[in-house]
């Protein structure tokens, strides 16, 4: 299909100093868990975006020196020749598809804890990092106040890193000053308390950054386009950088040294104000700030705001708010987003849902990222998975999939892409499984994009292969139904449900009196069904670390109920990693929801629950003989009155159908069945991203020797003395 001519402006080349970006799509720097020690992963993941039409593709934050070692988080480095060699794999792959490659020069100050290098960073003043106190970080980290000699040494570290980036082949060198990193700590009065010529007035606080840009420009000349990433407002009011004060003044002051501005808002402790989750922030949520940048510079501007909608992209470019569409998460969800716009396939875009699960993996530290929408993200190199290309089927075995949730619908989509005849059966009115329920919770409406993408693709694939079928609103299938169905391969994707009796991870037993068959006790599924009345006083018993309990609390508080949450773990603790945590806590406070932390439930009765502090038995331990606990009896139990109890304790796989079929394996051959598989939550409850991955994986590997269990993937391993597998080809090999 041809591109809609309305979008032509998005494909207009633009000069960036000595370089030219071929269109207006710019993958801003973002972490992916590869660093420089997994060059294959980095090369393949970034390269697929260049293939997909992103005109410029950047590294993640790239440490310039051991002083800014960001371990425990995995990030790139450009310290030496070895790093250059590993990064060159990405550069060459990006260039092979006609895109520019960019390197973001990172110096974190105390925000980079240097756990591996054990060095101390330098900064304008001494301060301890507010970022280092978030979950997953190692307590407080401090820097050293730089004297003039150390300041100049730091500037030279930037220059040396810029030269290494140029010699690696990068087209763009980006001095990272957003998210309270590097030069922003000198500009920002929140950090800079100096009284010499590098502190105090605006001109003095801007001096370090300006001098650094001058020195880099002299060193690299016009060999690269020079970029700086800048937070134009740190959202701290007069205590930080404000847009209409230091923000625009700095844009004007630094513009002569730059070829491109990469702008955003916020700091690092709450960088979800920039990488805004869809729960709180819509597309283009930074525009109230970014729309003013062009008045202070004549240089091109790239801005972000989770741009996933081509119409919104067109709007902001035509309005002159920004010149280039910057994106991280939308480029992860769909590496081919620009190409699909170019080819007139807008409805094929795999839209970012804004859940920030990708970010959560980096926030946890040490793990490669994942994507809820795109199961191939991070798997391109090690598994050879291309997001848009698939191996043709290797047999004529048709497949019956029972359950059209995240795992089942993704498995069906990929199998149909490969040419298999698939029958997808579900009891619900729509595909998507429990995503349909989750998307009804406050702020989570855009999570329905996960369902919508798969539904659209399945409908298209049905037209290509009329023998395929999607059967919705069906009665639950039995083992007899499946044995008689006639499919060669059977995939059970029946999902999971919340425990109806309060079984939880601390006791692995039901909570006495907790019984969701009673009118005053509900599971989340029963809340979604809406068949049970909910009383004025709602008590949520929470043993889960993610979104369900806080979302239900918000739902009922907004509806006028008095809500209390008794929670064993931090309420929505995992949401700290998805950058939803701070605003969720503000919202909980604003709505008057009462949170009882470190609190378990020992009994449920009509009209009340018995709660206890989980540490109430005291710390002293002694051996008291068989049948006796080593600590004192917990005496902190108290009764709390309520009208309705909601159990958010644990999820249990709905695997009865799978186990019945396995028990009747002797009947498979006579009924033409060769394999029965179980995937997604039906195998083990997990987040949507991992359930989707599991369905995708089975569809890719269904002809392998043991498809139920994933095949080994290619590891990027440093082995002592020799390669881990000397016969293994290190090149990227697509399974297409």
Swiss-Prot record:
Keywords per UniProt: 4Fe-4S, Flavoprotein, FMN, Iron, Iron-sulfur, Metal-binding, Oxidoreductase
User: What family is this protein classified in?
Assistant: In the N-terminal section; belongs to the NADH:flavin oxidoreductase/NADH oxidase family.
Residue positions binding substrate: 176-179
Q: Which residues carry this modification: S-6-FMN cysteine?
A: 31
Per the UniProt record, the lineage of the source organism begins with: Bacteria, Pseudomonadati, Pseudomonadota, Alphaproteobacteria, Hyphomicrobiales
Q: Mind telling me which InterPro entries this protein's record contains? A: Aldolase_TIM (IPR013785), FAD/NAD-bd_sf (IPR036188), NADH:flavin_oxidoreductase (IPR051793), OxRdtase_FMN_N (IPR001155), TMADH/DMDH/HD_second_a-b (IPR054428), TMADH/DMDH_FMN-bd (IPR037348)
Q: What is this protein called?
A: Dimethylamine dehydrogenase
Q: Name one GO biological process term.
A: catabolic process
| Residue positions of the active site | 181
* Entry's EC annotation: 1.5.8.1
> What does the entry list as the binding residues for [4Fe-4S] cluster?
352, 355, 358, 371
Q: How is its cofactor bound, per UniProt?
A: Binds 1 FMN covalently per subunit.
- What organism is the protein native to? Hyphomicrobium sp. (strain x)
Residue numbers binding FMN: 229, 329
Where ADP is bound, by residue? 398-427
Asked whether the keyword Cytoplasm is assigned, the reply is no
Question: Record's superkingdom?
Answer: Bacteria
Question: Broadest EC class?
Answer: oxidoreductase
MF (Gene Ontology) = 4 iron, 4 sulfur cluster binding; dimethylamine dehydrogenase activity; FMN binding; metal ion binding
Needs which cofactor? FMN; [4Fe-4S] cluster
Per the record, what are the reactions this protein catalyses?
dimethylamine + oxidized [electron-transfer flavoprotein] + H2O + H(+) = methylamine + reduced [electron-transfer flavoprotein] + formaldehyde
């Amino acid at each position: 299909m041809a591109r809609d001519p309305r979008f032509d402006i998005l494909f207009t080349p633009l000069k960036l100093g000595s370089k030219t970006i071929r269109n207006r799509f710019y993958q801003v720097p973002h972490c992916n868990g590869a660093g420089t020690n997994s060059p294959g992963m980095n090369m393949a993941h970034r390269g697929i975006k260049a293939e997909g039409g992103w005109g410029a593709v950047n590294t993640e934050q790239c440490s310039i020196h051991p002083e800014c070692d960001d371990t425990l988080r995995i990030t790139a480095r450009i310290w030496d020749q070895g790093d250059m060699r590993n990064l060159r794999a990405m550069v060459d792959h990006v260039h092979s598809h006609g895109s520019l490659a960019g390197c973001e020069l990172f110096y974190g100050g105390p925000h980079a804890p240097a756990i591996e290098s054990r060095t101390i960073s330098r900064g304008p003043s001494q301060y301890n990092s507010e970022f280092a106190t978030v979950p997953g970080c190692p307590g407080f980290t401090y820097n050293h106040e730089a004297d003039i000699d150390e300041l100049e040494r730091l500037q030279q570290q930037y220059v040396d890193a810029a030269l290494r980036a140029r010699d690696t082949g990068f087209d763009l060198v980006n001095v990272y000053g957003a998210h309270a990193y590097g030069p922003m700590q000198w500009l920002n009065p929140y950090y800079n308390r100096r009284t010499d010529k590098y502190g105090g007035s605006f001109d003095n606080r801007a001096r370090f950054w300006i001098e650094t840009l001058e020195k880099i420009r002299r060193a690299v000349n016009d060999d690269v386009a020079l970029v700086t990433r800048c937070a134009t407002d740190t959202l701290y009011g007069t205590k930080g950088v404000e847009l209409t004060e230091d923000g625009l003044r700095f844009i004007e002051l630094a513009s002569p040294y730059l070829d491109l501005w990469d702008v955003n808002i916020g700091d690092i402790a709450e960088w979800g104000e920039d990488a805004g989750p869809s729960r709180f922030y819509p597309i283009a949520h930074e525009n109230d700030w970014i729309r003013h940048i062009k008045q202070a510079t004549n240089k091109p501007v790239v801005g972000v705001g989770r741009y996933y909608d081509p119409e919104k992209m067109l709007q902001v470019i035509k309005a002159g708010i920004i010149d280039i569409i910057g994106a991280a998460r939308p480029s992860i969800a769909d590496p081919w987003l620009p190409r699909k716009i170019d080819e007139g396939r807008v409805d094929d875009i795999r839209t970012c849902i804004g859940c920030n699960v990708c970010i959560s993996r980096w926030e946890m530290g040490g793990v490669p990222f994942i994507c809820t929408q795109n199961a191939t993200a991070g798997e391109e190199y090690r598994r050879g998975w291309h997001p848009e290309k698939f191996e043709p089927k290797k047999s004529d075995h048709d497949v019956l999939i029972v359950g059209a949730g995240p795992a089942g619908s993704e498995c069906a989509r990929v199998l149909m892409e490969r040419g298999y005849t698939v029958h997808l059966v579900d009891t619900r009115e729509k595909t998507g499984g429990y995503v349909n329920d989750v998307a009804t919770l406050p702020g989570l409406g855009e999570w329905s994009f996960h369902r919508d993408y798969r539904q659209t693709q399945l409908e298209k694939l049905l037209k290509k292969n009329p023998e395929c079928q999607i059967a919705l609103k069906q009665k639950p299938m039995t083992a007899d139904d499946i044995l008689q169905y006639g499919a060669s391969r059977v995939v059970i994707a029946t999902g999971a449900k919340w425990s109806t009796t309060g079984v939880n991870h601390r006791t692995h037993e039901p909570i006495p009196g907790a019984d969701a068959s009673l009118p005053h006790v509900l599971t989340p599924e029963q809340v979604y069904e809406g068949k049970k009345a909910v009383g004025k006083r709602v008590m949520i018993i929470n043993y889960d670390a993610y979104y369900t309990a806080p979302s239900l609390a918000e739902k009922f508080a907004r509806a006028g109920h008095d809500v209390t949450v008794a929670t064993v773990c931090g309420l929505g603790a995992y949401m700290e990693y998805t950058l939803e945590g701070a605003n969720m806590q503000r919202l909980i406070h604003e709505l008057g929801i009462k949170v009882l932390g470190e609190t378990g439930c020992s009994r449920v009765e009509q009209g009340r629950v018995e709660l206890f502090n989980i540490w109430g038995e005291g710390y002293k331990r002694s051996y008291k003989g068989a049948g006796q606990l080593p600590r004192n009896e917990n005496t902190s139990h108290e009764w709390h009155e309520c009208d309705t109890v909601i159990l958010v304790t644990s999820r249990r796989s709905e695997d009865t159908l799978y186990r019945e079929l396995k028990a009747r394996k002797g009947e498979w051959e006579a009924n033409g069945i060769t394999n029965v598989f179980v995937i997604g939550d039906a195998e083990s409850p997990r987040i949507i991203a991992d359930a989707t991955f599991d369905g995708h994986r089975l569809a890719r590997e269904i002809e392998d020797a043991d498809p139920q269990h994933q095949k080994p993937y290619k590891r990027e391993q440093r082995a002592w003395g020799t390669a881990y597998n000397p016969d293994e080809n290190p090149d990227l090999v697509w399974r297409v």
